[in-house]
Regions:
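Hydrophobic membrane-insertion alpha-helices, especially the h-region
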Residues: 1-13
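N-terminal, intrinsically disordered, polar/charged segments of Gram-positive cell-envelope systems
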Residues: 15-59
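Domain-level detector of nuclease and nuclease-like folds
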Residues: 53-223
Length: 223
């Protein structure tokens, strides 16, 4: 059974209404085993699970505490221009997220390395560098083909309009696995009631041509 990891941290700082329990429904969780060649799949008709009482024009960012296995939980923010960085990203190589392995596959990966330290909330949105509560072990495919286009959409919208985007990224783990099966990404532009940005997707943490042991992070070329 696949589970979404929600740390109690969010409940301590925000009322339960802010962590919508519907995001744990079985239909969403089963998507983790249904990769069909696309980096992502729409969830809930591409409609995010936010409630109207969550919408605000004040920027914020909240990160879950790591669980007992050292895994990240929900990352939740209201992205505004004031959160976005004005300097280049700093060093993050000292962070070793759960399930991390440094391994190369030049046969199938142009950039060589299987894993990236993937920001749940991208650096261009939050300015977070080596925040261990915001970095998971993710494939190059997850990072570049899956998450980045959605992050770019949010970043471009905020820069162009000065508006806010409510944004939540939830890593999905199976049982006690150290590597996430993927992430659920939700976004909603606040001031224009979702006309500029609105999506709810599950992005697969896979790498074509590579077989991953999600329990440990070990990997091998597919036969």
């Amino acid at each position: 059974m696949v589970v979404l990891v929600f740390a109690l941290f969010l409940g301590n700082y925000l009322p339960g209404k802010y962590v919508n329990k519907e995001t744990t429904n079985e239909k969403v969780l089963l998507l983790a085993s249904e990769y069909n060649g696309s980096p992502f799949i729409e969830v809930n008709g591409n409609v995010p699970y936010f409630g109207e009482d969550e919408y605000t024009t004040e920027s914020f960012e909240i990160y879950s505490e790591l669980d007992s296995l050292g895994r990240c939980g929900v990352a939740y923010a209201n992205i505004g221009k004031d959160l976005m960085p004005v300097e280049e990203r700093g060093e993050i190589g000292m962070v070793k997220p759960s399930g991390w392995h440094t391994v190369k596959y030049p046969e199938v990966i142009e950039d060589l390395f299987l894993y990236n330290r993937c920001h749940l909330i991208g650096y261009q949105l939050s300015g977070e560098n080596a925040n261990v509560q915001n970095l998971i072990t993710g494939t190059r495919y997850l990072n570049v083909e899956g998450m980045l286009p959605f992050e770019n959409k949010v970043a471009s919208y905020v820069r162009e309009t000065g508006n806010h985007v409510l944004y939540r990224v939830t890593p999905v783990f199976e049982k006690d696995n150290l590597v996430a099966e993927g992430v659920q990404m939700e976004a909603y532009s606040v001031e224009d009631e979702g006309k500029g940005v609105a999506f709810c997707v599950f992005v697969y943490n896979v790498q074509p041509g590579i077989e991953i042991d999600y329990a440990t992070g070990k990997s091998k070329l597919c036969n």
